[in-house]
């Protein structure tokens, strides 16, 4: 048997089987390890699921708790709301009329008390009011928004002195004049009998520019200026404007215009030339002469010329003072208004604007001192004007112009050199001047009747013919235009014709009457084109109407009075006898 051959084939199969067995064992071992790992993962997942389930149960419990708390909060809020409504009803029931009126001074927010100086009750918040002259610190009703309470307002206090409402303001109070505005915002006010007081501004006046002479209402209990009052007393007599009248708009006053330009335009527009020659600009101009001769228009043209010819192109201001309306029965009021007028002029002049102060009807304000019959108001008004005019010396852009047809009544101190330096007589126009004035009113824009245009050959020729014939009718010294016979103290008689009473205003009135007559005839003709326009007959009719008006006026006036107001320059008159309208 030892020598029997080995079966190699069987041996190889055994080794192969053992190898496969080992691989199977290894695979089994790996499977068991994988199974163990999966078992551990399963256990971990089961534990995580258990944790999630526990958290879910806890969340459900918290949700249920929150729902219970929410229900309790809703119930509590409803109960609180009902309690607040009840408290408001009780508070409204407690605060019932009557209420007391008071003026609110200030509102205080709560703050920490200063130890050793004030107690907690002082700084809890509240408001300061003035009631019947007493200053009180009161509480503000919790139903009010304290931030909306404005100092100076009228408030209502209940029986416990708590502010329960705001009352509408009355706007009334003592009326005082501003004398000076202080740097800290306070105001120095002037009252009656030279009384002065310093007051604070109410919130409504914060930032408002107040000038000297402005009127304000004052609550004397709190010493506050409440509001500015726009009084018309000064504005009615003072027209602050920039005139649009030029010298070219004025006819028949060539010599007077030349004198005004020499006296005003040159020193105001070329002050350096005047200074080089040792001259100063005139402080004022006096325009005098009969009524209706263009004195006011000249003053307006001066203001316009100062602005139109200024090197800087700045505008000017024309302060037109209506003299009679400036007079006031209260002592010192007229003087105060004169100061206000010059203060306004200084404001504009300080800003670099040329200013013209024009006093119309100057004799009504500044008549000769001591000439009054029932009172001597001029004894204080005239010195006030003289003081203001002398004060104008330091200003470069102010000139005073006075106009009057009774220059004999004005105080001589006003007219002396150094005050109203330049005196210009504005006399009645002659025939050439009247034609020039009429051309300013009967312009190319005014329609002329077709018959007159056809007869003259052109509209311009017809206009010239109408003006020439109308002026000839006005200045005719025949028997038909004689109005009265004047006798002077020497016994000399003078025939008074319509030509002696013609003024720029009369010429303008003639043209206006003719225009109205033309409109009347045009409408009466059913607005037929052939009836349109002014014709010679309308102008002659207007001259006749003016002649009748002058006749009626002369028949009712005394000779001496007529001589003073009409510009009569002959001897003193003794009598005036009407020759027109007197039946034989």
UniProtKB/Swiss-Prot annotation:
GO terms of biological process kind: modification-dependent protein catabolic process; proteasomal protein catabolic process
Keywords: ATP-binding, Coiled coil, Nucleotide-binding
Protein residues bound to ATP: 292-297
Region (Disordered): 40-66
Organism domain of life: Bacteria
Gene Ontology CC entries for this record: proteasome complex
Gene3D superfamilies cross-referenced by the UniProt entry: 1.10.8.60, 1.20.5.170, Nucleic acid-binding proteins, P-loop containing nucleotide triphosphate hydrolases
Repressor keyword on record: no
SMART domains for the chain: AAA
Coiled-coil positions: 10-96
InterPro entries: AAA+_ATPase, AAA_ATPase_domain, ATPase_AAA_core, ATPase_AAA_CS, NA-bd_OB-fold, P-loop_NTPase, Prot_ATP_ID_OB_2nd, Prot_ATP_ID_OB_N
Molecular functions (GO terms): ATP binding; ATP hydrolysis activity
Subunit structure: Homohexamer. Assembles into a hexameric ring structure.
Family according to the record: Belongs to the AAA ATPase family.
Protein's recorded name: AAA ATPase forming ring-shaped complexes
High-level lineage: Bacteria, Bacillati, Actinomycetota, Actinomycetes, Micrococcales
Gene name of the encoded protein: arc
């Amino acid at each position: 048997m030892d020598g029997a051959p080995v079966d190699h084939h069987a041996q190889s199969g055994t080794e192969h089987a053992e190898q496969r067995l080992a691989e199977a064992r290894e695979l089994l071992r790996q499977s068991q390890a994988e199974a163990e790992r999966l078992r551990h993962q399963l256990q971990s997942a089961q534990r995580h699921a258990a944790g999630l389930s526990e958290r879910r149960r806890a969340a459900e419990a918290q949700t249920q708790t929150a729902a219970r708390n929410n229900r309790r909060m809703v119930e509590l809020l409803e109960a609180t709301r009902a309690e607040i409504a009840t408290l408001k009803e009780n508070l409204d029931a407690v605060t019932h009329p009557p209420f007391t009126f008071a003026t609110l001074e200030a509102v205080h927010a709560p703050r920490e008390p200063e130890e050793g100086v004030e107690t907690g009750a002082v700084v809890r918040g509240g408001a300061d009011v003035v009631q019947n002259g007493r200053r009180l610190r009161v509480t503000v009703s919790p139903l009010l928004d304290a931030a909306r309470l404005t100092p100076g307002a009228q408030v209502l206090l209940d029986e416990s002195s708590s502010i329960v409402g705001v009352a509408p303001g009355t706007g009334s109070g003592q009326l005082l004049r501003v004398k000076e505005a202080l740097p800290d915002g306070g105001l120095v006010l002037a009252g009656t009998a030279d009384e002065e007081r310093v007051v604070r501004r109410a919130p409504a006046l914060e930032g408002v520019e107040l000038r000297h002479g402005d009127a304000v209402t004052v609550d004397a209990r709190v010493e506050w200026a409440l509001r500015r009052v726009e009084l018309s007393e000064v504005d009615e007599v003072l027209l602050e404007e920039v005139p649009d009248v030029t010298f070219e708009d004025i006819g028949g006053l060539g010599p007077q215009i030349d004198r005004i330009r020499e006296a005003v335009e040159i020193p105001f527009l070329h002050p350096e030339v005047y200074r080089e020659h040792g001259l100063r600009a005139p402080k004022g101009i006096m325009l005098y002469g009969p009524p209706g001769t263009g004195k006011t228009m000249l003053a307006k043209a001066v203001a316009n010329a100062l602005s139109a010819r200024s090197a800087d192109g700045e505008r000017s201001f024309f302060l037109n003072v209506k003299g009679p309306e400036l007079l006031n029965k209260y002592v010192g009021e007229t003087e105060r208004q004169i100061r206000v007028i010059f203060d306004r002029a200084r404001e504009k002049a300080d800003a670099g604007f040329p200013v013209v102060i024009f006093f119309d009807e100057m004799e009504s304000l500044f008549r000769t001192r001591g000439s009054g019959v029932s009172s001597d108001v001029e004894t204080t008004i005239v010195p006030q004007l003289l003081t203001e005019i002398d004060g104008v010396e330091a200003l470069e852009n102010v000139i005073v112009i006075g106009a009057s047809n009774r220059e004999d009544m004005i105080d001589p101190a006003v007219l002396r050199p150094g005050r109203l330096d330049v005196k210009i007589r504005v006399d009645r126009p002659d025939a050439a001047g009247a034609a020039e004035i009429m051309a300013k009113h009967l312009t190319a824009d005014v329609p002329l009747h077709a018959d007159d245009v056809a007869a003259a050959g052109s509209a311009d020729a017809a206009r010239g013919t109408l003006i020439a014939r109308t002026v000839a009718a006005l200045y005719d010294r025949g028997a038909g235009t004689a109005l009265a016979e004047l006798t002077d103290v020497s016994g000399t008689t003078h025939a008074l014709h319509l030509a002696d009473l013609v003024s720029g205003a009369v010429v303008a009135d003639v043209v206006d009457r003719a225009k109205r007559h033309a409109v009347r005839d045009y409408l009466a003709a059913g607005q037929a084109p052939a009836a349109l326009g002014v014709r010679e007959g309308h102008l002659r009719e207007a001259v006749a109407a003016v002649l009748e008006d002058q006749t009626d006026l002369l028949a009712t006036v005394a000779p001496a009075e007529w001589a003073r107001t009409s510009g009569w320059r002959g001897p003193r008159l003794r009598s005036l006898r009407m020759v027109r309208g007197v039946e034989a």
